[in-house]
């Protein structure tokens, strides 16, 4: 028993190390490896003594492995085998051990849900509910609204035909619990999904109402990540409804955050900057659009966001008459192997910049996108630009190839 207490102390120390590493935004692989060695000693004690670990020790192990607010799925899975070993060991012992194993199984399902792996969460929950049904002694112990709520979310995520049923059931059954911090995250997830459902059905006012509820619930319980995400969605929805000034008010509130807590909050702020620049573009304030978008041009952002920024900078410069700058930002637009297409406005802008002829690959992408979009004037002009460059480069084989595509397009339009 002294050995177990000693190991429990080590686990607490390691838990603090992991939390420190997370604050520094480092991977905790080495610390997980250290914990693994200690936990193997726990398992050996279990096998030798045929008895469960002290309840406090169980929670020390779990609290270290539990990666609630770290969406690093790789790290979660590395810890997974260890938790499953503990669960399997418990199942061979007395009732208290089985209760502990089920509790770890429940906690494991929460870990997966926080990493948005709802399929894996659903599998774990199914296992939990089967065990609960088979062993009536567990029913009272695990009559847990939070667990039921998580189950409804998983059903909603994996059964697209009955989405609204599960959302409504979850919100109505647990609407009185959202003021408690332990329920707030799940309550907000259901509200986000409700808003998304209304948006898909073009009911933007109902979507706004759902986002507003998220903001209120998350703010009351200091769930800043949820409240920021909801404020961003709220602002974007107002922009879709045409209320740009109110949209900007919410976006500027997000952008003003000086020190985001983590990388996810940073990405939310980046998204707010991009949407703010888009609003200025819609209003025709090209100087403000340019000044807003340029702040992200050299940031480490996703390819999709990078392309948004390039488009905003190119278009605002184009509208201000800075054609050289516009073309330069066009060339920074990244086309992936799977998607070599430009937005329609981008095509027209590039076409109008024909005096500063873009490179051959850009013109090929431009013509290909025009064919996909089917706008005849875009096709005609982009085809002429492309063939002029191919002839100039004496690349007659490629010129014939694209001439053939052009003829096929013209023939299909006649039909």
Residue spans for each PLM region:
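Short alpha-helical DNA-recognition segment
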Residues: 26-45
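Amphipathic alpha-helical segments of tetratricopeptide repeats
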Residues: 102-109, 139-142, 169-179, 212-223, ...
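Structural signature of alpha-solenoid helical repeat junctions
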Residues: 111-118, 143-150, 179-186, 226, ...
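A short, Lys/Arg-rich alpha-helix, primarily the initiator
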Residues: 1-24
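TPR/TPR-like (Sel1-like) alpha-helical repeat modules
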Residues: 391, 396-413
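DNA major-groove recognition helix of helix-turn-helix/homeodomain DNA-binding modules
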Residues: 54-72
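Tandem amphipathic alpha-helical repeat scaffolds
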Residues: 82-91, 118-131, 148-165, 186-201, ...
